[in-house]
Amino acid sequence: MAKEDCIEMEGTVLDTLPNTMFRVELENGHVVTAHISGKMRKNYIRILTGDKVTCEMTPYDLSKGRIIYRAR
């Protein structure tokens, strides 16, 4: 799947789950389960509850996503 097909949304981390998974509430009110992207994992970017993040989702499954950016 091409990168252009992904949907990017802003959200807030609600909860930390096992295996570097997070529960994220998006701007539109939906709650998704998201994991950290590989570059964030490689650079040891820490994500805590309450952080503002950018989440990338595929149009095929809107309940799962990938965290690609953490706002400062």
Curated annotation (Swiss-Prot):
Q: What is its main location?
A: cytoplasm
SUPFAM superfamilies the UniProt entry points to? Nucleic acid-binding proteins
Keyword Protein biosynthesis in the entry? The reply is yes
SMART domains per record: S1
Q: Where is the S1-like domain?
A: 1-72
Q: Name one GO molecular function term.
A: rRNA binding
Q: Which PROSITE patterns match?
A: S1_IF1_TYPE
The Gene Ontology CC terms held by the record are: cytosol
Q: Which cell locations does it reside in?
A: Cytoplasm
Which top-level group of life is the source organism from?
A: Bacteria
Task: Give the record's keywords alphabetically.
Answer: Cytoplasm, Initiation factor, Protein biosynthesis, RNA-binding, rRNA-binding
So what family is this one in? Belongs to the IF-1 family.
Role of this protein: One of the essential components for the initiation of protein synthesis. Stabilizes the binding of IF-2 and IF-3 on the 30S subunit to which N-formylmethionyl-tRNA(fMet) subsequently binds. Helps modulate mRNA selection, yielding the 30S pre-initiation complex (PIC). Upon addition of the 50S ribosomal subunit IF-1, IF-2 and IF-3 are released leaving the mature 70S translation initiation complex.
Q: Quaternary arrangement and interactors, per the entry?
A: Component of the 30S ribosomal translation pre-initiation complex which assembles on the 30S ribosome in the order IF-2 and IF-3, IF-1 and N-formylmethionyl-tRNA(fMet); mRNA recruitment can occur at any time during PIC assembly.
Q: What is this protein called?
A: Translation initiation factor IF-1
Q: Which organism is it from?
A: Pseudoalteromonas atlantica (strain T6c / ATCC BAA-1087)
